[in-house]
Amino acid sequence: MHPLWAFLLGLSLTNGLSANCPGRCSCDSMQSVQCYRLMELPSGIPSTTKRLYISHSRIQHLQLSNFTGLLALEDFILLASGTESIENDTFKTLSTLKTLELWKNKLRQVPSALPANLEVLKLNDNAICALRGSEFEGLKNLKVLELKNNLISSLSPSMLSPLASLQSLMVDGNNIESVVGPLSLPHLKYMSMENNQLHLIPGNVFTSLQNLQFLSFSGNFLTKIPINLPKSLLSLKMERNQLKVVRFRDMKHLENLSHLYLSENFLSSIDGAQQLTNLTTLEVSQNQLQMLPPRLPSRLQKLDCSSNFIQRVTAPEFQDLRDLKHLFLDNNVVSLFEAGALQRCSQLSNLALEQNLLLSIPLRLPKTLARLDLKGNAIQDMAERELRDLKQLQVLNLRNNRISALDFKALEGLPRLRHLYLDGNPWNCTCSLLRAREVLKAKGTDVKGGQCAAPAERQGESWMSSKKILRQCEHHLQQSEKSKETKKKPKPEDSSSIRLNMDDDDDDYEID
Protein backbone atom coordinates (compact mmCIF):
# COMPACT_ATOMS: atom_id res chain seq x y z
CA MET A 1 0.00 0.00 0.00
CA HIS A 2 1.21 3.49 -0.86
CA PRO A 3 2.42 5.34 2.29
CA LEU A 4 0.01 8.22 1.64
CA TRP A 5 -3.00 5.90 1.47
CA ALA A 6 -1.86 4.14 4.65
CA PHE A 7 -1.62 7.49 6.44
CA LEU A 8 -5.07 8.60 5.29
CA LEU A 9 -6.61 5.27 6.32
CA GLY A 10 -5.04 5.50 9.78
CA LEU A 11 -6.25 9.07 10.13
CA SER A 12 -9.81 8.11 9.23
CA LEU A 13 -9.78 5.25 11.76
CA THR A 14 -8.49 7.56 14.47
CA ASN A 15 -11.10 10.17 13.74
CA GLY A 16 -13.83 7.54 13.74
CA LEU A 17 -12.67 6.21 17.07
CA SER A 18 -12.54 9.67 18.63
CA ALA A 19 -16.01 10.44 17.30
CA ASN A 20 -17.42 7.40 19.16
CA CYS A 21 -15.62 8.23 22.40
CA PRO A 22 -17.66 9.81 25.24
CA GLY A 23 -16.79 13.22 26.65
CA ARG A 24 -14.03 13.41 29.30
CA CYS A 25 -12.79 10.05 28.01
CA SER A 26 -9.96 8.91 25.77
CA CYS A 27 -10.24 5.83 23.58
CA ASP A 28 -7.43 3.99 21.83
CA SER A 29 -7.04 1.32 19.20
CA MET A 30 -6.27 -1.26 21.90
CA GLN A 31 -9.97 -1.17 22.87
CA SER A 32 -9.22 0.71 26.07
CA VAL A 33 -11.28 3.63 27.41
CA GLN A 34 -10.07 5.98 30.17
CA CYS A 35 -12.35 8.59 31.76
CA TYR A 36 -11.81 11.23 34.44
CA ARG A 37 -14.02 13.59 36.51
CA LEU A 38 -17.38 12.19 35.47
CA MET A 39 -20.73 12.72 37.19
CA GLU A 40 -22.13 9.41 35.90
CA LEU A 41 -21.04 6.42 33.89
CA PRO A 42 -21.15 7.66 30.28
CA SER A 43 -23.31 6.21 27.55
CA GLY A 44 -21.90 5.58 24.13
CA ILE A 45 -18.87 3.59 25.24
CA PRO A 46 -17.77 1.51 22.20
CA SER A 47 -19.20 -2.02 22.38
CA THR A 48 -15.76 -3.44 21.55
CA THR A 49 -14.20 -1.98 24.71
CA LYS A 50 -12.15 -4.52 26.66
CA ARG A 51 -10.76 -2.23 29.35
CA LEU A 52 -12.70 0.58 31.05
CA TYR A 53 -10.85 2.79 33.55
CA ILE A 54 -12.66 5.58 35.44
CA SER A 55 -10.90 7.72 38.03
CA HIS A 56 -11.54 10.69 40.34
CA SER A 57 -15.19 11.06 39.47
CA ARG A 58 -18.48 11.50 41.35
CA ILE A 59 -20.45 8.38 40.53
CA GLN A 60 -22.54 7.63 43.59
CA HIS A 61 -24.40 4.61 42.19
CA LEU A 62 -23.76 1.87 39.61
CA GLN A 63 -26.61 -0.01 37.93
CA LEU A 64 -27.19 -2.76 35.42
CA SER A 65 -28.09 -0.37 32.59
CA ASN A 66 -24.64 1.26 32.80
CA PHE A 67 -23.08 -1.84 31.25
CA THR A 68 -25.66 -2.78 28.62
CA GLY A 69 -23.91 -3.66 25.40
CA LEU A 70 -20.40 -3.97 26.88
CA LEU A 71 -20.24 -7.68 26.08
CA ALA A 72 -16.48 -7.64 25.38
CA LEU A 73 -15.48 -5.98 28.66
CA GLU A 74 -12.63 -7.81 30.44
CA ASP A 75 -11.33 -5.21 32.92
CA PHE A 76 -13.34 -2.59 34.83
CA ILE A 77 -11.47 -0.24 37.18
CA LEU A 78 -13.33 2.43 39.16
CA LEU A 79 -10.96 4.46 41.32
CA ALA A 80 -11.70 7.22 43.85
CA SER A 81 -15.16 8.06 42.53
CA GLY A 82 -17.29 8.19 45.69
CA THR A 83 -19.38 5.14 44.74
CA GLU A 84 -21.62 4.07 47.65
CA SER A 85 -23.92 1.43 46.17
CA ILE A 86 -24.22 -1.04 43.30
CA GLU A 87 -27.50 -2.44 42.03
CA ASN A 88 -27.94 -6.21 42.37
CA ASP A 89 -26.77 -8.22 39.36
CA THR A 90 -25.03 -5.19 37.82
CA PHE A 91 -22.03 -7.26 36.71
CA LYS A 92 -23.79 -10.61 36.28
CA THR A 93 -24.21 -10.42 32.50
CA LEU A 94 -20.57 -9.42 31.86
CA SER A 95 -19.51 -12.97 31.04
CA THR A 96 -16.08 -11.88 29.73
CA LEU A 97 -15.17 -9.81 32.82
CA LYS A 98 -11.93 -11.06 34.41
CA THR A 99 -10.79 -8.09 36.50
CA LEU A 100 -12.97 -5.90 38.74
CA GLU A 101 -11.27 -3.17 40.78
CA LEU A 102 -13.33 -0.72 42.85
CA TRP A 103 -10.63 1.08 44.87
CA LYS A 104 -11.08 4.06 47.19
CA ASN A 105 -14.84 4.30 47.13
CA LYS A 106 -17.55 4.11 49.83
CA LEU A 107 -18.90 0.60 49.33
CA ARG A 108 -20.34 -1.09 52.42
CA GLN A 109 -20.56 -4.59 50.98
CA VAL A 110 -19.15 -6.81 48.26
CA PRO A 111 -21.16 -6.51 45.01
CA SER A 112 -23.61 -9.40 44.51
CA ALA A 113 -23.87 -11.90 41.65
CA LEU A 114 -20.40 -11.41 40.24
CA PRO A 115 -19.63 -13.11 36.90
CA ALA A 116 -18.30 -16.67 37.05
CA ASN A 117 -15.19 -15.94 34.94
CA LEU A 118 -13.88 -13.28 37.31
CA GLU A 119 -10.21 -13.85 38.22
CA VAL A 120 -9.22 -10.66 40.07
CA LEU A 121 -11.38 -8.75 42.60
CA LYS A 122 -9.90 -5.71 44.37
CA LEU A 123 -12.10 -3.76 46.79
CA ASN A 124 -9.41 -1.94 48.77
CA ASP A 125 -10.11 1.29 50.67
CA ASN A 126 -13.87 1.04 51.07
CA ALA A 127 -16.18 0.70 54.10
CA ILE A 128 -16.99 -3.03 53.89
CA CYS A 129 -17.84 -4.32 57.38
CA ALA A 130 -18.46 -8.02 56.85
CA LEU A 131 -18.03 -10.84 54.35
CA ARG A 132 -20.68 -13.38 53.46
CA GLY A 133 -20.04 -16.57 51.57
CA SER A 134 -23.03 -15.90 49.34
CA GLU A 135 -21.21 -12.90 47.85
CA PHE A 136 -18.55 -15.20 46.44
CA GLU A 137 -20.84 -17.99 45.21
CA GLY A 138 -19.88 -19.29 41.80
CA LEU A 139 -16.47 -17.59 41.72
CA LYS A 140 -14.57 -20.81 41.07
CA ASN A 141 -12.03 -19.02 38.87
CA LEU A 142 -11.17 -16.19 41.27
CA LYS A 143 -7.41 -16.13 41.91
CA VAL A 144 -6.84 -12.74 43.58
CA LEU A 145 -8.96 -11.16 46.34
CA GLU A 146 -7.92 -7.87 47.93
CA LEU A 147 -9.92 -6.20 50.71
CA LYS A 148 -7.29 -3.95 52.27
CA ASN A 149 -8.27 -0.98 54.43
CA ASN A 150 -11.91 -1.82 55.09
CA LEU A 151 -13.80 -2.44 58.36
CA ILE A 152 -13.87 -6.25 58.43
CA SER A 153 -13.69 -7.68 61.97
CA SER A 154 -13.40 -11.45 61.41
CA LEU A 155 -12.59 -14.21 58.93
CA SER A 156 -14.17 -17.66 58.91
CA PRO A 157 -14.17 -20.68 56.56
CA SER A 158 -17.77 -20.10 55.47
CA MET A 159 -16.92 -16.66 54.11
CA LEU A 160 -14.26 -17.88 51.72
CA SER A 161 -15.19 -21.52 51.04
CA PRO A 162 -16.59 -20.89 47.51
CA LEU A 163 -13.18 -19.61 46.36
CA ALA A 164 -11.66 -22.96 45.45
CA SER A 165 -9.03 -21.47 43.08
CA LEU A 166 -7.94 -18.51 45.21
CA GLN A 167 -4.16 -17.96 45.17
CA SER A 168 -3.77 -14.55 46.82
CA LEU A 169 -5.71 -13.08 49.77
CA MET A 170 -4.93 -9.63 51.17
CA VAL A 171 -6.95 -8.18 54.06
CA ASP A 172 -4.42 -5.71 55.48
CA GLY A 173 -5.58 -2.69 57.46
CA ASN A 174 -8.95 -3.94 58.72
CA ASN A 175 -10.24 -4.49 62.26
CA ILE A 176 -9.86 -8.27 62.23
CA GLU A 177 -9.70 -9.58 65.79
CA SER A 178 -10.26 -13.27 65.10
CA VAL A 179 -9.63 -15.89 62.46
CA VAL A 180 -11.51 -19.19 62.61
CA GLY A 181 -10.02 -22.25 60.96
CA PRO A 182 -9.51 -24.21 58.99
CA LEU A 183 -9.52 -21.95 55.94
CA SER A 184 -10.32 -24.25 53.02
CA LEU A 185 -8.23 -22.62 50.33
CA PRO A 186 -6.10 -25.44 48.91
CA HIS A 187 -4.46 -23.33 46.18
CA LEU A 188 -3.66 -20.26 48.30
CA LYS A 189 -0.02 -19.17 47.92
CA TYR A 190 -0.03 -15.64 49.33
CA MET A 191 -1.87 -14.41 52.43
CA SER A 192 -1.41 -11.05 54.14
CA MET A 193 -3.25 -9.88 57.26
CA GLU A 194 -1.03 -6.95 58.19
CA ASN A 195 -2.16 -4.14 60.49
CA ASN A 196 -5.18 -5.75 62.12
CA GLN A 197 -6.14 -6.46 65.75
CA LEU A 198 -5.05 -10.09 66.02
CA HIS A 199 -3.89 -11.40 69.39
CA LEU A 200 -4.01 -15.14 68.67
CA ILE A 201 -4.00 -17.41 65.61
CA PRO A 202 -5.63 -20.84 66.18
CA GLY A 203 -3.48 -23.80 65.24
CA ASN A 204 -6.03 -25.24 62.82
CA VAL A 205 -6.15 -22.16 60.54
CA PHE A 206 -3.44 -23.56 58.26
CA THR A 207 -4.61 -27.20 58.07
CA SER A 208 -5.83 -26.86 54.47
CA LEU A 209 -3.29 -24.28 53.31
CA GLN A 210 -0.71 -26.76 52.13
CA ASN A 211 0.47 -24.63 49.19
CA LEU A 212 0.94 -21.39 51.13
CA GLN A 213 4.32 -19.78 50.38
CA PHE A 214 4.09 -16.18 51.62
CA LEU A 215 2.46 -15.25 54.94
CA SER A 216 2.39 -11.89 56.72
CA PHE A 217 0.97 -11.06 60.15
CA SER A 218 2.99 -7.86 60.58
CA GLY A 219 1.45 -5.05 62.61
CA ASN A 220 -0.75 -7.06 64.98
CA PHE A 221 -0.64 -7.92 68.69
CA LEU A 222 0.69 -11.47 68.50
CA THR A 223 2.88 -12.64 71.37
CA LYS A 224 4.09 -15.81 69.67
CA ILE A 225 4.58 -17.20 66.20
CA PRO A 226 1.56 -19.31 65.13
CA ILE A 227 2.00 -23.07 65.39
CA ASN A 228 1.35 -25.63 62.67
CA LEU A 229 2.49 -23.35 59.88
CA PRO A 230 2.44 -25.12 56.49
CA LYS A 231 5.63 -26.85 55.42
CA SER A 232 5.43 -25.12 52.04
CA LEU A 233 6.13 -21.67 53.54
CA LEU A 234 8.96 -19.65 51.93
CA SER A 235 8.51 -16.28 53.65
CA LEU A 236 7.10 -15.33 57.07
CA LYS A 237 6.64 -11.72 58.18
CA MET A 238 6.00 -11.03 61.88
CA GLU A 239 7.26 -7.46 62.27
CA ARG A 240 5.59 -4.98 64.60
CA ASN A 241 4.01 -7.48 66.97
CA GLN A 242 4.63 -8.21 70.66
CA LEU A 243 6.94 -11.21 70.38
CA LYS A 244 9.20 -11.73 73.37
CA VAL A 245 10.52 -15.15 72.41
CA VAL A 246 10.77 -17.29 69.28
CA ARG A 247 10.48 -21.05 69.71
CA PHE A 248 12.40 -22.37 66.73
CA ARG A 249 11.65 -25.94 67.76
CA ASP A 250 8.03 -25.27 66.73
CA MET A 251 9.29 -24.16 63.31
CA LYS A 252 11.87 -26.81 62.46
CA HIS A 253 9.47 -28.49 60.02
CA LEU A 254 9.66 -25.34 57.84
CA GLU A 255 12.46 -26.75 55.76
CA ASN A 256 11.66 -24.46 52.81
CA LEU A 257 11.55 -21.19 54.78
CA SER A 258 14.07 -18.74 53.30
CA HIS A 259 12.92 -15.32 54.62
CA LEU A 260 12.02 -14.54 58.25
CA TYR A 261 11.15 -11.00 59.36
CA LEU A 262 10.97 -10.32 63.12
CA SER A 263 11.81 -6.62 63.37
CA GLU A 264 10.10 -4.23 65.81
CA ASN A 265 9.24 -6.72 68.53
CA PHE A 266 10.48 -7.24 72.09
CA LEU A 267 13.01 -10.01 71.54
CA SER A 268 15.94 -10.01 73.97
CA SER A 269 17.65 -13.03 72.40
CA ILE A 270 17.54 -15.23 69.31
CA ASP A 271 18.78 -18.79 69.65
CA GLY A 272 18.10 -21.93 67.65
CA ALA A 273 17.68 -20.40 64.20
CA GLN A 274 20.08 -23.02 62.80
CA GLN A 275 17.08 -25.39 62.70
CA LEU A 276 15.80 -23.38 59.72
CA THR A 277 18.44 -24.83 57.44
CA ASN A 278 17.41 -23.00 54.24
CA LEU A 279 17.04 -19.54 55.78
CA THR A 280 18.76 -16.87 53.65
CA THR A 281 17.30 -13.67 55.19
CA LEU A 282 16.83 -12.92 58.89
CA GLU A 283 15.71 -9.46 60.01
CA VAL A 284 15.58 -8.70 63.75
CA SER A 285 16.09 -4.93 63.83
CA GLN A 286 14.50 -2.74 66.52
CA ASN A 287 14.32 -5.38 69.22
CA GLN A 288 16.13 -5.63 72.56
CA LEU A 289 19.05 -7.86 71.59
CA GLN A 290 22.19 -7.40 73.68
CA MET A 291 24.27 -9.90 71.73
CA LEU A 292 24.40 -11.28 68.22
CA PRO A 293 22.31 -14.40 67.57
CA PRO A 294 24.49 -17.51 67.95
CA ARG A 295 24.35 -20.61 65.73
CA LEU A 296 22.78 -19.08 62.66
CA PRO A 297 21.93 -21.12 59.53
CA SER A 298 24.95 -21.57 57.27
CA ARG A 299 23.06 -20.46 54.14
CA LEU A 300 22.22 -17.03 55.53
CA GLN A 301 22.87 -14.21 53.04
CA LYS A 302 21.34 -11.22 54.84
CA LEU A 303 21.36 -10.51 58.58
CA ASP A 304 19.80 -7.30 59.91
CA CYS A 305 20.41 -6.68 63.62
CA SER A 306 20.25 -2.89 63.44
CA SER A 307 18.77 -0.74 66.23
CA ASN A 308 19.40 -3.09 69.14
CA PHE A 309 21.79 -3.00 72.11
CA ILE A 310 24.60 -5.19 70.77
CA GLN A 311 27.99 -4.37 72.31
CA ARG A 312 30.43 -6.90 70.82
CA VAL A 313 31.19 -8.49 67.47
CA THR A 314 33.33 -11.61 67.70
CA ALA A 315 34.34 -14.40 65.35
CA PRO A 316 32.29 -17.34 66.77
CA GLU A 317 28.95 -15.84 65.65
CA PHE A 318 30.14 -15.74 62.04
CA GLN A 319 32.38 -18.76 61.66
CA ASP A 320 29.87 -20.74 59.57
CA LEU A 321 28.35 -17.84 57.58
CA ARG A 322 30.34 -18.22 54.37
CA ASP A 323 27.37 -17.13 52.20
CA LEU A 324 26.65 -13.91 54.12
CA LYS A 325 26.49 -10.90 51.75
CA HIS A 326 24.73 -8.16 53.75
CA LEU A 327 25.27 -7.44 57.45
CA PHE A 328 23.48 -4.56 59.19
CA LEU A 329 24.67 -3.67 62.70
CA ASP A 330 23.93 0.05 62.62
CA ASN A 331 22.42 1.90 65.59
CA ASN A 332 23.75 -0.39 68.28
CA VAL A 333 26.35 0.21 71.00
CA VAL A 334 29.19 -1.80 69.48
CA SER A 335 32.47 -0.80 71.12
CA LEU A 336 34.41 -4.02 70.57
CA PHE A 337 34.90 -5.45 67.09
CA GLU A 338 37.30 -8.36 67.16
CA ALA A 339 40.00 -8.23 64.47
CA GLY A 340 39.15 -10.70 61.72
CA ALA A 341 35.70 -11.42 63.18
CA LEU A 342 34.20 -11.55 59.67
CA GLN A 343 37.08 -13.24 57.85
CA ARG A 344 35.06 -16.41 57.27
CA CYS A 345 32.32 -14.38 55.52
CA SER A 346 34.00 -14.73 52.16
CA GLN A 347 31.12 -13.18 50.16
CA LEU A 348 30.30 -10.18 52.36
CA SER A 349 29.78 -7.07 50.21
CA ASN A 350 27.79 -4.71 52.45
CA LEU A 351 28.65 -3.90 56.08
CA ALA A 352 26.67 -1.26 58.00
CA LEU A 353 28.17 -0.09 61.31
CA GLU A 354 26.75 3.45 61.53
CA GLN A 355 25.92 4.99 64.90
CA ASN A 356 27.98 2.78 67.19
CA LEU A 357 30.84 3.41 69.64
CA LEU A 358 33.81 2.30 67.55
CA LEU A 359 37.12 4.10 68.13
CA SER A 360 38.79 2.70 65.02
CA ILE A 361 38.01 0.96 61.75
CA PRO A 362 37.83 -2.81 62.41
CA LEU A 363 40.90 -4.76 61.32
CA ARG A 364 41.00 -7.56 58.74
CA LEU A 365 37.59 -7.01 57.22
CA PRO A 366 36.60 -9.31 54.32
CA LYS A 367 38.32 -8.48 51.04
CA THR A 368 34.99 -8.70 49.22
CA LEU A 369 33.48 -5.58 50.82
CA ALA A 370 31.99 -3.13 48.32
CA ARG A 371 30.28 -0.82 50.84
CA LEU A 372 31.39 0.07 54.36
CA ASP A 373 29.29 2.45 56.49
CA LEU A 374 30.94 3.82 59.64
CA LYS A 375 29.01 7.06 60.06
CA GLY A 376 28.49 8.40 63.58
CA ASN A 377 31.17 6.55 65.54
CA ALA A 378 34.17 7.94 67.43
CA ILE A 379 36.84 6.97 64.89
CA GLN A 380 39.92 9.21 65.12
CA ASP A 381 42.13 7.80 62.40
CA MET A 382 42.03 6.11 59.00
CA ALA A 383 45.14 3.97 58.78
CA GLU A 384 46.60 2.03 55.88
CA ARG A 385 46.60 -1.26 57.76
CA GLU A 386 42.83 -1.06 58.38
CA LEU A 387 41.95 -0.76 54.70
CA ARG A 388 44.86 -2.34 52.83
CA ASP A 389 42.98 -5.46 51.66
CA LEU A 390 39.72 -3.80 50.63
CA LYS A 391 40.44 -3.76 46.88
CA GLN A 392 36.72 -4.10 46.01
CA LEU A 393 35.52 -1.21 48.20
CA GLN A 394 33.42 1.29 46.25
CA VAL A 395 31.60 3.23 48.99
CA LEU A 396 33.13 4.36 52.29
CA ASN A 397 31.06 6.44 54.71
CA LEU A 398 33.02 8.11 57.52
CA ARG A 399 30.63 10.97 58.28
CA ASN A 400 30.39 12.41 61.81
CA ASN A 401 33.48 10.86 63.35
CA ARG A 402 36.58 12.47 64.91
CA ILE A 403 39.00 12.14 62.02
CA SER A 404 41.34 15.09 61.50
CA ALA A 405 43.83 13.62 58.99
CA LEU A 406 43.90 11.13 56.12
CA ASP A 407 46.69 8.73 55.25
CA PHE A 408 47.07 9.07 51.48
CA LYS A 409 48.66 5.61 51.34
CA ALA A 410 45.45 4.13 52.73
CA LEU A 411 43.56 5.77 49.87
CA GLU A 412 46.03 4.52 47.28
CA GLY A 413 45.18 1.00 48.42
CA LEU A 414 41.49 1.44 47.47
CA PRO A 415 41.59 1.22 43.65
CA ARG A 416 37.80 0.96 43.15
CA LEU A 417 36.69 3.66 45.61
CA ARG A 418 33.94 5.72 43.94
CA HIS A 419 32.18 7.48 46.83
CA LEU A 420 33.75 8.82 50.03
CA TYR A 421 31.69 10.64 52.69
CA LEU A 422 33.75 12.79 55.06
CA ASP A 423 31.49 15.60 56.33
CA GLY A 424 31.12 16.12 60.06
CA ASN A 425 34.79 15.50 60.92
CA PRO A 426 37.21 18.04 62.51
CA TRP A 427 39.70 18.25 59.63
CA ASN A 428 43.13 19.71 60.38
CA CYS A 429 43.90 21.22 56.99
CA THR A 430 47.67 21.04 56.88
CA CYS A 431 49.42 20.84 53.54
CA SER A 432 49.99 17.10 54.00
CA LEU A 433 46.22 16.58 53.73
CA LEU A 434 46.40 17.75 50.13
CA ARG A 435 48.34 14.60 49.23
CA ALA A 436 45.14 12.72 50.01
CA ARG A 437 43.22 15.14 47.80
CA GLU A 438 45.53 14.47 44.85
CA VAL A 439 45.07 10.71 45.26
CA LEU A 440 41.28 11.04 45.38
CA LYS A 441 41.16 13.31 42.33
CA ALA A 442 43.41 10.99 40.35
CA LYS A 443 41.09 8.04 40.89
CA GLY A 444 37.92 10.10 40.23
CA THR A 445 36.39 9.51 43.66
CA ASP A 446 33.26 11.52 44.48
CA VAL A 447 33.98 13.13 47.85
CA LYS A 448 31.28 14.66 50.06
CA GLY A 449 32.35 17.04 52.81
CA GLY A 450 35.79 17.91 54.14
CA GLN A 451 35.46 21.32 55.82
CA CYS A 452 38.45 22.53 57.79
CA ALA A 453 38.19 22.91 61.57
CA ALA A 454 41.86 23.93 61.95
CA PRO A 455 44.09 25.87 61.63
CA ALA A 456 42.06 28.96 62.43
CA GLU A 457 42.83 30.77 59.18
CA ARG A 458 41.39 27.88 57.15
CA GLN A 459 38.22 27.19 59.14
CA GLY A 460 35.20 26.64 56.93
CA GLU A 461 37.30 26.05 53.81
CA SER A 462 36.93 22.77 51.94
CA TRP A 463 40.27 21.03 51.54
CA MET A 464 38.91 19.20 48.48
CA SER A 465 38.02 22.34 46.52
CA SER A 466 39.68 25.39 48.11
CA LYS A 467 42.00 27.20 45.67
CA LYS A 468 43.31 29.27 48.56
CA ILE A 469 44.65 26.21 50.39
CA LEU A 470 46.06 24.85 47.15
CA ARG A 471 48.04 28.07 46.53
CA GLN A 472 49.33 28.14 50.09
CA CYS A 473 50.48 24.53 49.86
CA GLU A 474 51.77 24.56 46.28
CA HIS A 475 55.43 24.57 47.35
CA HIS A 476 54.83 21.67 49.77
CA LEU A 477 53.22 19.58 47.02
CA GLN A 478 56.08 20.29 44.62
CA GLN A 479 58.62 19.20 47.21
CA SER A 480 56.63 16.00 47.84
CA GLU A 481 56.59 15.21 44.12
CA LYS A 482 60.36 15.79 43.84
CA SER A 483 60.96 13.56 46.84
CA LYS A 484 58.81 10.85 45.28
CA GLU A 485 60.70 11.06 41.97
CA THR A 486 64.04 10.84 43.78
CA LYS A 487 62.95 7.67 45.54
CA LYS A 488 61.86 6.13 42.24
CA LYS A 489 65.14 6.95 40.42
CA PRO A 490 67.23 3.72 40.19
CA LYS A 491 70.90 3.40 41.17
CA PRO A 492 72.85 1.44 38.49
CA GLU A 493 75.03 -0.38 40.98
CA ASP A 494 72.10 -1.81 42.97
CA SER A 495 69.58 -3.15 40.41
CA SER A 496 68.73 -6.22 42.48
CA SER A 497 67.62 -4.11 45.42
CA ILE A 498 65.53 -1.98 43.05
CA ARG A 499 63.66 -5.02 41.83
CA LEU A 500 63.14 -6.16 45.39
CA ASN A 501 61.77 -2.77 46.41
CA MET A 502 59.43 -2.72 43.45
CA ASP A 503 58.13 -6.12 44.42
CA ASP A 504 57.61 -4.88 47.96
CA ASP A 505 55.61 -1.93 46.63
CA ASP A 506 53.48 -4.26 44.57
CA ASP A 507 52.75 -6.32 47.66
CA ASP A 508 51.03 -3.28 49.14
CA TYR A 509 48.40 -3.57 46.42
CA GLU A 510 47.86 -7.29 46.41
CA ILE A 511 45.27 -9.29 48.28
CA ASP A 512 46.74 -11.98 50.45
From Swiss-Prot:
Q: Which residues are glycosylated?
A: 66
**What keywords sit in the KW lines?**
Glycoprotein, Leucine-rich repeat, Repeat, Secreted, Signal
Q: Name one GO cellular component term.
A: extracellular matrix
| Gene Ontology biological process terms, A to Z | extracellular matrix organization; negative regulation of transcription by RNA polymerase II; negative regulation of transforming growth factor beta receptor signaling pathway
Show me the LRR repeat boundaries: 45-69, 71-93, 94-117, 119-138, 139-162, 164-185, 186-208, 210-232, 234-253, 254-276, 277-299, 301-320, 321-344, 346-371, 373-389, 390-413, 415-442
Q: Does the keyword Repeat apply?
A: yes
Q: Per the annotation, which location comes first and is thus the protein's main one?
A: secreted
Could you tell me where the Acidic residues compositional bias lies?
A: 503-512
The family database entries (Gene3D superfamilies) matched by this protein are listed as:
Ribonuclease Inhibitor (3.80.10.10)
Specify the signal sequence span. Answer: 1-19
Quote the subcellular location field of this record: Secreted
Listed Pfam families: LRR_4, LRR_8
The entry's comment on post-translational modification says: N-glycosylated.
Where are the annotated segments for Disordered? 474-512
Q: In which tissues is it expressed?
A: Expressed at highest levels in the kidney, where it is primarily detected in the epithelial cells of distal tubules and collecting ducts, and more weakly in proximal epithelial cells. Expressed at lower levels in heart and lung (at protein level). Detected in skeletal muscle.
Segments forming domain LRRNT? 20-44
- Basic and acidic residues bias locations: 474-484
The entry's family comment says: Belongs to the small leucine-rich proteoglycan (SLRP) family.
Q: What does this protein do?
A: May inhibit TGF-beta signaling.
Q: What is this protein called?
A: Nephrocan
Q: Which organism is it from?
A: Mus musculus (Mouse)
Q: Which gene encodes it?
A: Nepn
